[in-house]
A protein has these predicted regions:
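Domain-level signature for soluble enzymes in the chorismate/prephenate branch of the shikimate pathway
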Residues: 1-281
């Protein structure tokens, strides 16, 4: 897709914004304050695609997204892995020795705590990394800095005082590319693919064990299996899973047949090309 609009959660300059421009440079990135708003923009047709983070190599899964996916009606058509780098930025003319306070999301400050400690900065948490940069641009302060992606510094006219200050340089976020198209074009023939799905097993003894048996006996590689509660109920457990392959593959067809027999709900969220980044890890 070479035109149109792509939704993301956050403000202009966020990591999700960077992911949008890297994957779809000809599309217009459209910020939304919440994941719910981003999903709704895709469903309503205001945006043709969405770039949604689902997990981070340090912080783990994005819980809000896992709850939204099954009920969204959206399909996953792609994935992107993005290395995450944080920059320490301030208003023009400010020097490192002038700083006393740093502002950003709590998780961003936590991931850069070595630099924050070394500079002796007091942490001030806000809701968004790019938002921290925007607030600093709107209210200049010679003693305050922000931790945000490099794109935020360019957008809001801030100077980068220290680059790539994250403690761990293998910090990576995985994004899903979403569409409202109920029957999206399948991945190209021959491409390595991933299929994502959700299910809830029937109330039977060893139902989960039995539901999973078909994947082992048919040689299907399951790369992810996560549980989460539905509507806050401890007794209603959903499972989110990912496997290598396409639903039309004979082995996966047989595995899904066995899964559905032991499940009261089963839904494929999408089949999409595996990001080449997977081969680097």
């Amino acid at each position: 897709m070479t035109n149109g609009r792509i939704a993301f959660q956050g403000e202009l300059g966020a990591n999700s914004h960077e992911a949008c421009t890297a994957a779809f440079p000809d599309m217009e990135p459209v910020p939304h304050p919440t994941f719910e708003d981003a999903f709704e923009a895709i469903k309503a047709g205001d945006c043709q695609l969405g770039m949604i983070p689902v997990e981070n190599s340090i912080a783990g899964r994005v819980a809000d997204v896992h709850h939204l996916l099954p009920s969204s009606g959206l399909k996953i058509i792609g994935e992107r892995f993005k290395p995450i780098h944080f920059q320490l930025m301030a208003n023009p003319g400010v020097k490192l020795e002038d700083l006393k306070v740093v502002q950003s999301m709590a998780i961003a400050i936590h991931q850069c705590r070595a630099t924050v400690r070394r500079l002796g900065l007091k942490a001030d948490t806000v809701g968004d990394t790019a938002g921290a940069a925007r607030m600093l641009a709107d209210h200049p302060d010679p003693h305050r800095a922000a931790i945000a992606p490099a794109l935020a510094a360019r957008i809001y006219g801030l100077d980068i005082l220290a680059r790539d200050i994250e403690d761990r340089h293998n910090n990576t976020t995985r994004f899903m590319i979403m569409t409202a198209d109920a029957d999206p074009e399948p991945p190209a023939a021959g491409a390595d693919c991933v299929t994502s799905f959700v299910f809830r097993v029937r109330n039977l003894p060893a139902a989960l064990y039995k539901a999973m048996g078909g994947f082992a006996t048919n040689g299907v590689n399951m790369t992810k299996l996560e549980s989460y509660m539905e509507n806050g109920a401890f007794t209603a457990t959903f499972f989110y899973a990912e496997v290598d392959g396409r639903p039309e593959d004979p082995a996966l067809q047989r595995a899904f047949e066995e899964l559905t027999f032991f499940s009261e709900r089963f839904e494929i969220l999408g089949t999409y090309p595996a990001d080449p980044f997977r081969k680097q890890v």
